From Swiss-Prot:
Underlying gene: kduI
Pathway assignment: Glycan metabolism; pectin degradation; 2-dehydro-3-deoxy-D-gluconate from pectin: step 4/5
UniProt keyword list: Isomerase, Metal-binding, Zinc
Cofactor annotation comment: Binds 1 zinc ion per subunit.
Organism: Bacillus pumilus (strain SAFR-032)
Identification of the protein by name: 4-deoxy-L-threo-5-hexosulose-uronate ketol-isomerase
Cofactor(s) of this protein: Zn(2+)
């Protein structure tokens, strides 16, 4: 498990591109036959990728969490961004197709990931600390109704799926969903906003090999950018905007954790305040 400490915004003002990427960019999540985990001190979330090959892979706390098992004091949201796969939770199997979600609550000891025959599954996961056990629940993307947002004139027509949240799958603090931009649309989360009571992490998806997303971060008066390729993630502290524009349309999985469980608790930044 790779450790990522929190960083003060005053320090970020002086970061080079390499330093920005080292602290906030997650370049490698999916390696065949491996479980990759990153521990962020921003609200103590764990971000990870699981790509089972011939044998199943078990979610293990390792030495870093200092617990008997991974979900002893945590909850987790999982999205399959690869081929069909199965997540088995204390003996109960959940089959996840491409972009299906699964929430697993506090206290489950044995979580295993497996790929079906054919294309390997890629399980993206975000875990937050938890104080109460909520039921394990699956959400199939084909059965969800998105919110249609944006305008063609602003190049931001998109479909927002809220999955783990106060009015959907219940959790302690974790919120999670996916946003898919339509063809010829490139902007996400613009006008930008911040939410000082929650951190957020984006996983960018559906990006062609020769395309990129320019992810904007930083305080509104001190913005910076990171250039991201397909299946790369970025950590967004509570003080930072989190917006992006691609060379073509794309999707991104968003996940939030922190003090406030209200999705609409955010402060929009007027365009004339961005620098």
């Amino acid at each position: 498990m790779e450790n990522r400490y929190a960083v003060h915004p005053e320090q970020v003002k002086r970061f080079t591109t390499e330093e920005l990427r080292r602290h906030f960019h997650i370049p490698t999540l999916f390696v065949s036959g491996e479980l990759k985990l990153y521990y962020s001190h921003e609200d103590r979330v764990v971000i990870g990728g699981v790509m089972p090959s011939a044998e199943p892979l078990k979610l293990d706390a390792g030495d870093f969490l200092r617990t008997e098992y991974f979900l002893e004091r945590r909850e987790i949201g999982i999205v399959n961004v690869g081929g069909q796969g199965t997540v088995t939770v204390d003996g109960e199997a959940f089959v996840l197709e491409h972009k299906d979600f699964l929430y697993i609550g506090l206290g489950h000891e044995d979580v295993q990931f497996a790929s079906a025959s054919g294309e390997e599954a890629k399980f993206y996961l975000v875990s937050a600390t938890a104080h109460q056990a909520y039921p394990t629940q699956k959400a199939a993307i084909a059965e969800l109704t998105p919110n249609h947002l944006g305008e063609a004139s602003a190049s931001n027509v998109r479909n927002l799926y809220q999955v783990i949240h106060a009015n959907g799958i219940q959790s302690c603090q974790l919120m999670m969903g996916i946003t898919q931009l339509e063809t010829n649309n490139t902007w996400n989360t613009m006008p930008a906003h911040i939410h000082d009571r929650r951190m957020e992490v984006y996983l960018y998806l559906d990006i062609e090999e020769d395309a990129r997303v320019f992810h904007f971060m930083g305080e509104p008066s001190e913005t910076r950018h990171l250039v991201l390729a397909n299946e790369e993630a970025v950590i967004s502290p509570a003080w930072s905007i989190h917006s992006g524009s691609g060379t073509a349309n794309y999707s991104f999985i968003w996940a939030m954790a922190g003090e406030n469980y209200t999705f609409k608790d955010m402060d929009f930044v007027p365009m004339d305040q961005l620098r």
